[in-house]
Every structure is written in structure tokens, then in C-alpha cells.
Amino acid sequence: MKKRKIRYDRILLPILILCVIIFGISSCHKTEETKIQSKPIHTTTDFLKNALKPVGQTLYIYGGGWNEAQTGSGTEALTLGLSKEWKSFYDTQDNTYNYENYMYEIHKGLDCSGYVGWTIYNTLETKSKHGNGYVLKAEEMTKTFANMKLGSYKDSIQNAKPGDIVSMANAHVYIVLAVCEDGSLLIAHSSPPGVKISGTYDQNGNSNSQAVLYAKKIMKTYYPDWYSRYPDCTVDSR
């Protein structure tokens, strides 16, 4: 069987950048997906650095990042820096964690839109408790952010780039970290069990994609405790 040639020069650069970001210093199909391209008010690197801060230590909480009424940003999503309660709650759990046992315990972790909203707040704002924040329904994020002049809106994920925010029709939202040659995306998102790096299927619908392999390497290397509990790094974005 003929092996697929991988353009490592195109894939390893964003992965290298990602590894640098992880250490705190600074391209790897879905209908009805939309994205918002990052606007360079603050650099994409700033945005991705913030996106990685909760990774591997923040569990998925349905409603996490929202206020008590579930109408917008909660305290954590209006605060600069990580909430100490996220890591504390993570430390009390193990590989049997089930988010359904902690629904709406909003201070313990983040859901997908709470995570993206927190990341944007920590990138754009300079002080806590300023304004209304950026948490809203996942499927509405891309259009709303474009209307807020935070980026441009497209109704397709073709030509995705690192820093893009992608809203999915199934009420999920994620941040693109890198684009792989097989069409798969390396992403950061909050999805059960929590905030993690994952890889999407490739353009042919295969789950063993380049992005999935890179996600596993990154999580295993830089977040070993998380990976020992939650080794699944695959997300079906079709």
C-alpha cells in the first residue's frame, strides 16, 4: 500500500509554535460550521497562549463560565487569570469523572462557550469585572463576534487558520490551533471531560488523523496527569 507523503515542513511549524506557547513563551468537514477569523488587535499568539492556560487542569461543567441565570458571562469569565477552584475541583476527581453529576455547578469548571468567552476576555481586557464579557450560546458566537468587529465571519471552515473560532451546528465551539495537511484540525476546546487539545477527523472521515496523533503527543508529553486519566484526543467535527 502506498504511504501518504506528509509535508512535515508545513505541519511541524505550528506544532513547534504550540509547544513554545505551552511553555509560556509565545497548516496540522463539517456542514453548517462557521468560523470567525482572529482579528490582530492582539496577536494570535496572545490569544492561543490564553487558550492553553486552562488545558489539562479544568474539567467540563455544563454551564461553567456562565452566570447563575445562564444569560451571559459569570464571575470566572469576567476575571483575568485562572480560577483556583478549577484546579482544586480537578484534583478531587479521577478517570471516572462524569460531568452529569455536577450540572450547573458553574464555579467548578467551564463548558465550551464559557471557555472561549474566558479566553477572549483574558486576551482583550486589562482588568477584571469590566463590561459584559464574551460568553454566549456556542452556535451564536462567530456571527456575534464578527458583528462586534472582533473578526470576520465565514460560513465555512475551508482555509481555517490558527486562532480561528469555529461554531458548530451541534452547539459546540472550539479554537483552531493548527491545520494539518490531511485536512484535520488541531483544536483547543472544553468538551467532556474538560478543557483539552484534540484532533478532528481528516477530510476523508478517518479518526486516526494527523491532528489526533499530534494531540495525543502533546497531551501525553505536557499534560501527563490529564492524559493518564483521559487519553481520548479525538473529536468528530463532521
Where are each of the predicted segments found?
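N-terminal Sec-pathway targeting helices
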Residues: 2-14
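Hydrophobic membrane-insertion alpha-helices, especially the h-region
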Residues: 14-22
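C-terminal motif of bacterial Sec signal peptides marking the signal peptidase cleavage site
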Residues: 24-27
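Bacterial signal peptide processing site
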Residues: 29-31
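N-terminal capping segments
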Residues: 33-125
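...with weaker cross-activation on analogous glycine-rich loops/strands in unrelated enzymes
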Residues: 125-199
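Low-complexity, Gly/Ser/Thr/Pro-rich intrinsically disordered linker/tail segments
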Residues: 202-238
